């Protein structure tokens, strides 16, 4: 999109945010940032804090485009996408199938691996079956299958004699199905895809945190983004290729972001492992995709305008 083109469209954009998942606060932050910037671009914007009446609200509102700033279940698992397909309202990001598939970490990993993407060893389990015995040799990671923003992620270290009790306790709020994945040491890297183009690779360096968890993602100053990442050119290109391959294999549209581990402790070439793909990457002031776009010379306003103009049904 050319600079200033949005001001000539006059499109009415409904920004969906909030919702009722565990990532509600993140979604509100993304939604407010996106709505404010789209208004500055000249779009007519309506902000919708999503509840169970969202379909009737959209029918009455009749927007030209829905900008989906929801995160977590209902917002990025194919549910709201199905509603928008039924209502025939063009929307941003991925469609029903890709959203549902990407939200399921285990199944998304199998599809990516079948396309040639290198993934970590893992197994799908019911959390109650983990019990007091390690399901695999530590270190390993226990992840809820259908959560984002690192909610419920537990790292089990080599010196822990038993799995953490919280996994099987009543305090666990992230569903019974979990993925147990071998822990991959090394650097946190991520790569966004915009349309059919892999963008820059970014290194995430949490400040004072063991890994890129909820706080290091969304607390200002809790992580540093190095973009472009300082890695060998062939490794850089390999990560871009893997991100684009996963994006295509899963059937993503618009913008996605793939996360990686790069273990270069023993050699510069190291080992690159794909962890997961995010079809609704954060758009908060501390989020990665806006930083990656900025490194490519694309402003936040230009990124959002491109996403609005890219919106469609049958995605």
Swiss-Prot record:
As for what it does, the entry says: Cell wall formation.
Pfam annotation, one family: Dala_Dala_lig_N
Q: Where does Mg(2+) 1 bind?
A: 259, 276
The record's listing under SUPFAM superfamilies reads:
Glutathione synthetase ATP-binding domain-like (SSF56059), PreATP-grasp domain (SSF52440)
**InterPro entries, per the entry:** ATP-grasp (IPR011761), ATP_grasp_subdomain_1 (IPR013815), D-Ala_lig_Van_CS (IPR000291), D_ala_D_ala (IPR005905), Dala_Dala_lig_C (IPR011095), Dala_Dala_lig_N (IPR011127), PreATP-grasp_dom_sf (IPR016185)
Can you tell me which residues bind Mg(2+) 2? 276, 278
Q: What GO cellular component entries does it have?
A: cytoplasm
UniProt xrefs under HAMAP family:
Dala_Dala_lig
What keywords are assigned to this protein? ATP-binding, Cell shape, Cell wall biogenesis/degradation, Cytoplasm, Ligase, Magnesium, Manganese, Metal-binding, Nucleotide-binding, Peptidoglycan synthesis
Any one GO molecular-function label of the UniProt entry = D-alanine-D-alanine ligase activity
Please tell me whether the keyword DNA repair is annotated for this protein.
no
- Keyword match ATP-binding: yes
**Annotated GO biological process:** cell wall organization; peptidoglycan biosynthetic process; regulation of cell shape
Please list the reactions this protein catalyses: 2 D-alanine + ATP = D-alanyl-D-alanine + ADP + phosphate + H(+)
Predominant location: cytoplasm
Would you tell me the protein name for this molecule?
A: D-alanine--D-alanine ligase B
Pathway it works in: Cell wall biogenesis; peptidoglycan biosynthesis
Where is this protein localized, as stated in its record? Cytoplasm
Q: Which Gene3D superfamilies match?
A: 3.40.50.20, ATP-grasp fold, A domain, ATP-grasp fold, B domain
- Which parts of the sequence belong to the ATP-grasp domain? 109-309
For this chain's record, the cofactor binding note is: Binds 2 magnesium or manganese ions per subunit.
Question: What gene does the UniProt entry assign to this protein?
Answer: ddlB
Q: Tell me which residues bind ATP.
A: 135-190
| Necessary cofactors | Mg(2+); Mn(2+)
Which family is this sequence assigned to? Belongs to the D-alanine--D-alanine ligase family.
Where would you find the membrane-spanning parts of this chain?
none
């Amino acid at each position: 999109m050319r600079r200033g083109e949005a001001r000539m469209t006059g499109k009415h954009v409904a920004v969906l945010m909030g919702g009722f998942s565990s990532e509600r606060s993140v979604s509100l932050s993304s939604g407010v940032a996106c709505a404010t910037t789209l208004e500055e671009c000249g779009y007519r914007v309506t902000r919708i804090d999503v509840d169970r009446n969202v379909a009737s609200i959209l029918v009455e509102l009749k927007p030209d485009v829905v900008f989906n700033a929801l995160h977590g279940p209902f917002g990025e698992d194919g549910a709201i996408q199905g509603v928008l397909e039924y209502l025939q309202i063009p929307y941003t990001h991925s469609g029903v199938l890709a959203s549902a598939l990407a939200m399921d970490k285990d199944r998304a990993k199998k599809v990516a691996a079948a396309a040639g993407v290198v993934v970590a060893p893992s197994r799908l389990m019911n959390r109650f079956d983990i019990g007091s015995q390690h399901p695999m040799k530590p270190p390993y990671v226990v992840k809820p299958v259908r959560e984002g923003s690192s909610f419920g992620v537990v790292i089990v270290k080599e010196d822990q004699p038993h799995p953490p009790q919280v996994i099987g306790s009543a305090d666990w709020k992230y569903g019974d199905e979990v993925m147990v994945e071998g822990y991959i040491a090394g650097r946190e890297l991520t790569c966004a895809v915009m349309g059919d183009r892999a963008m820059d690779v970014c290194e995430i360096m949490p400040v004072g945190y063991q890994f890129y968890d909820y706080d290091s993602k969304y607390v200002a100053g809790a992580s540093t983004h190095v973009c472009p990442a300082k890695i060998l050119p062939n490794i850089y290109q390999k990560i871009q290729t893997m991100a684009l391959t996963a994006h295509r294999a899963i059937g993503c549209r618009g913008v996605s972001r793939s996360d990686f581990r790069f273990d270069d402790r023993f050699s510069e070439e190291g080992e690159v492992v794909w962890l997961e793909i995010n079809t609704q990457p954060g758009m908060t002031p501390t989020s990665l995709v806006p930083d990656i776009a900025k490194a490519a010379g694309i402003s936040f306003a230009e990124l959002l305008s491109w996403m609005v103009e890219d919106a469609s049904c049958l995605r």
